[in-house]
Amino acid sequence: MTISRPEQEVKILVEKDPIKTSFEKWAKPGHFSRNLSKGPNTTTWIWNLHADAHDFDSHTSDLEDISRKVFSAHFGQLAVIFIWISGMYFHGARFSNYEAWLSDPIHIKPSAQVVWPIVGQEILNGDVGGGFQGIQITSGFFQIWRASGITSELQLYTTAIGGLVMAGLMLFAGWFHYHKAAPKLAWFQDVESMLNHHLAGLLGLGSLAWAGHQIHVSMPINELLDAGVDPKEIPLPHEFILNRDLIAELYPSFKSGLIPFFTLNWSAYSDFLTFRGGLNPVTGGLWLSDTAHHHLAIAVLFLIAGHMYRTNWGIGHNMKDILEAHKGPFTGEGHKGLYEIFTTSWHAQLSLNLAMLGSLTIIVAHHMYSMPPYPYLAIDYGTQLSLFTHHMWIGGFCIVGAAAHAAIFMVRDYDSANQYNNLLDRVIRHRDAIISHLNWACIFLGFHSFGLYIHNDTMRALGRPQDMFSDTAIQLQPIFAQWIQNTHVLAPSLTAPQATSATSPVWGEGLITVGGKVAMMPIPLGTADFLVHHIHAFTIHVTVLILLKGVLFSRSSRLIPDKANLGFRFPCDGPGRGGTCQVSAWDHIFLGLFWMYNSLSIAIFHFSWKMQSDVWGNVTPQGISHITGGNFAQSSITINGWLRDFLWAQASQVIQSYGSPLSAYGLIFLGAHFVWAFSLMFLFSGRGYWQELIESIVWAHNKLKVAPAIQPRALSIVQGRAVGVAHYLLGGIATTWAFFLARIISVA
């Protein structure tokens, strides 16, 4: 008797034509809410409309419909991204000096915007070299185009059109997968299939495609550009792809084709897949042959990873099994219950993803300058500073967003009945110990780190430099950081004998200069860095304290035991309970944003000053002339030094920018200060003040018989705070942007 295997049933995971396509709802603002669809009685309606329009949880409790809306919205987001990137490429094609920059990237600055002569605005068109007048850009697009092998504006045009085609495709997909073929809930919850497809498809095949592009297109074109060949003389990408003899002139192993691959003689390919380490001395960027090798290796890893999870074939990992097996001697039930959380709460899933992506973005910020991935990026100081600042802020917002969605998960989706004695439950049960210890750490770090600066300010004021903490008096050397630097210098000889140098000159060996400018060199760390790193530790710990307290106390606290019933955002625990304001999970996000801004301001200020003082500069016969002449070590060890020698001294360019091509930064600097100050109006005054004022103004309108039909109302407490923090951050970020760019474009 033969026992045959039961037939695998094909699951139908798509519902056909679930929702009719109709524009009728577009004409009904607030159609998703019974209250809002009635239309406005008071001005609060428009604020609630904005607050709830994308809060799909508030529209329906049907998880399948919520999932479909989120999925569809993702395609809309991708369409916006494709339109944006298409616009960037179009600007490069239509309004830029890309071809001129490509022929002389050392002396010509990138520009992709020319201002029309209206009311004298053409003053903004500065001379960027090569006879081109325009606004200098610091986005890094020219460098990434060079690394991709783009040699003409026609190629930028065609890529821009491709971006618009992709945007159209994404918009179609968003409509199709909501109205025509909408996935069922089971499809969204099939995590093993999702992992396989995302790992093997997006990351594996994505990296493989990029490695293929780098090898067949980018590297030969960049090899010729580095050798000084005129971009117009370089063969087109398809010629390198189709004509093996052409690329074999540059990389002889191409003559052998795939024979070395199948005979396992992989070292034959080492002419274009290298493991050099360090930076290319011609361009100041990573060796493109190293990055091609890296992407090929990443592709192999992720293609393997994309076959690890169990789907229809009964082999491989099962996420539920992995999570439930994950327990130690002190962790109770471990991760039991976590699978159910991540397959039924998209807020929990989003929180995890934002935390990981935010951390990764900050890691990217630190690698962009220390291991510049694109040619000539390292000597474009404005772009280096912009990319660091941009990635730091994006990472910070993602991490605060992670806390926000963790708290929303706790309030809306957490079911304590299913979470008994697992790690999450145990963390929540000893939250008092966690928060009080973290609070102690914040107090310790705050007093000690700030105290070191106050000591130095006092000693300098009293004329006692010998009693200061500095490299020339009482030294506080960052010995662990110096040990890590030294370890990385030694690493190639120990762990990677084939590599010719360490991952970056930052660690302590070699000076890379391009066109007489420092691309990268060893970054010495001393007492000044020790001091400011402890300020970083302090501000980061306070940010974490606020965000973590918000998450752990989002459902209940001693003060408000039934907090979960009040929701994610609420002003106070009702009338008659004084002292219960600003306790909602939303308020912790609100406060966390300010400390995130504090943390990152100090981090980007540290980076900006340190690089200008100790790294960036010109090579002269007498040695290296740094932009601020190495003043960081002695000036940044006092609060007064930060105020006088960094903020004030380096603000002179933006303050004096009027009448120059940088004058827009002067106006932005001024305007952003106003936006920031405007935020304080919302943050410092209570709702009652404004309601009284409004009622007085309404009285005057009634007198004149011009009273509005929609009753004016003061912003709610939560709305006022939201407007306040938005303007605080917008004003602060734009002020910093203008300050940094006017400075670095002037001196670089």
Swiss-Prot record:
UniProt remark on cofactor binding: P700 is a chlorophyll a/chlorophyll a' dimer, A0 is one or more chlorophyll a, A1 is one or both phylloquinones and FX is a shared 4Fe-4S iron-sulfur center.
Positions of phylloquinone binding: W690
Transmembrane segments: 70-93, 156-179, 195-219, 291-309, 346-369, 385-411, 433-455, 530-548, 588-609, 662-684, 722-742
Protein topology in the membrane: Multi-pass membrane protein
Catalysed conversion reaction: reduced [plastocyanin] + hnu + oxidized [2Fe-2S]-[ferredoxin] = oxidized [plastocyanin] + reduced [2Fe-2S]-[ferredoxin]
GO cellular component: chloroplast thylakoid membrane; photosystem I
Residues that coordinate or bind [4Fe-4S] cluster: C572, C581
Signal sequence annotation: none
Alphabetically ordered keywords of this record: 4Fe-4S, Chlorophyll, Chloroplast, Chromophore, Electron transport, Iron, Iron-sulfur, Magnesium, Membrane, Metal-binding, Oxidoreductase, Photosynthesis, Photosystem I, Plastid, Thylakoid, Transmembrane, Transmembrane helix, Transport
GO MF annotation, one: 4 iron, 4 sulfur cluster binding
Residue positions binding chlorophyll a: M681, Y689
EC number, as in UniProt: 1.97.1.12
EC top class, as a word: oxidoreductase
GO biological process: photosynthesis
Family of this protein: Belongs to the PsaA/PsaB family.
Job of this protein: PsaA and PsaB bind P700, the primary electron donor of photosystem I (PSI), as well as the electron acceptors A0, A1 and FX. PSI is a plastocyanin-ferredoxin oxidoreductase, converting photonic excitation into a charge separation, which transfers an electron from the donor P700 chlorophyll pair to the spectroscopically characterized acceptors A0, A1, FX, FA and FB in turn. Oxidized P700 is reduced on the lumenal side of the thylakoid membrane by plastocyanin.
Quaternary structure annotation from Swiss-Prot or TrEMBL: The PsaA/B heterodimer binds the P700 chlorophyll special pair and subsequent electron acceptors. PSI consists of a core antenna complex that captures photons, and an electron transfer chain that converts photonic excitation into a charge separation. The eukaryotic PSI reaction center is composed of at least 11 subunits.
Protein name listed in UniProt: Photosystem I P700 chlorophyll a apoprotein A1
Organism from which the protein derives: Chara vulgaris
Origin organism lineage: Eukaryota, Viridiplantae, Streptophyta, Charophyceae, Charales
Gene of this entry: psaA
